[in-house]
């Protein structure tokens, strides 16, 4: 091999190494999850997904279920499930999925009447969710024939009993040919008082921790350490594929925990993205994101 040929090989090798070092790691890339459904002025599902800013959409909320109650979907001003006017969102769910966006049905929320009375009750609820929102069959599917990607646990009321049974039962449906994603939105104090047992089942794919309305474990007045300590506790204690930093999309969206976009992108995300379990950012909610433009401000850094 001539000296000139050797020099060319060395140059190509160094160029390859420099490109490899400068390329962002796939592990550090994240997506944005958004809650949609609780304000009729936030646009429809198709418009939400067409923004190109979101990788996950949680349709919120199924507010009533369990203990023999007739399940009730509440989509605020978007439609009236009781009058069967929400079925047109089925085509919009499919539109989102065609863009590679995962769409989940979110259970619970801060207002509602939900609980699980027993292991048998958990199975009844799981069967209802399978037949009405997932891959099963029912004549009364609230969102039409769309097959959602999974179920989100946003449990903020009631008893901690049997949410683990529901998670285990739902996960079994994945064996029917299509993956059923399980996601959860616990409060940042660890362990979550209502969802702790469910999250310990190791059945959850994504966990978007609510780092707001809980000052001891969220950002406040330039203090990032409480948030970092809580993040580390969650990511080292719970066996989930990915964890997300859950935030209010505007100061008015929560009582505390709002992080200015420049602080998030410069002081917080660079640290969180070092975690191999980092998945991205979750925002509450689409309505507040529209008002404040938060996702647009942070998207390139997520």
Swiss-Prot record:
GO terms for biological process: cellular response to water deprivation; chitin catabolic process; pattern recognition receptor signaling pathway; polysaccharide catabolic process; response to cold; response to light intensity; response to salt stress; response to wounding. It comes from the Eukaryota. Changing residue 180 to V: In strain: cv. Ita-0 and cv. Pog-0. Residues 31-302 form the GH18 domain. GO terms for cellular component: extracellular region. It is found in: Secreted, Extracellular space. Its main location: secreted. It is an enzyme of class 3 (hydrolase). GO terms for molecular function: beta-glucosidase activity; endochitinase activity; lysozyme activity. Changing residue 120 to K: In strain: cv. Ci-0. Changing residue 174 to T: In strain: cv. Yo-0. Induction: Expression of the acidic chitinase gene was not detected in normal, untreated plants nor in plants treated with ethylene or salicylic acid. Keywords: Carbohydrate metabolism, Chitin degradation, Disulfide bond, Glycosidase, Hydrolase, Polysaccharide degradation, Secreted, Signal. This is Acidic endochitinase. The lineage of its organism: Eukaryota, Viridiplantae, Streptophyta, Embryophyta, Tracheophyta. The gene is CHIB1.
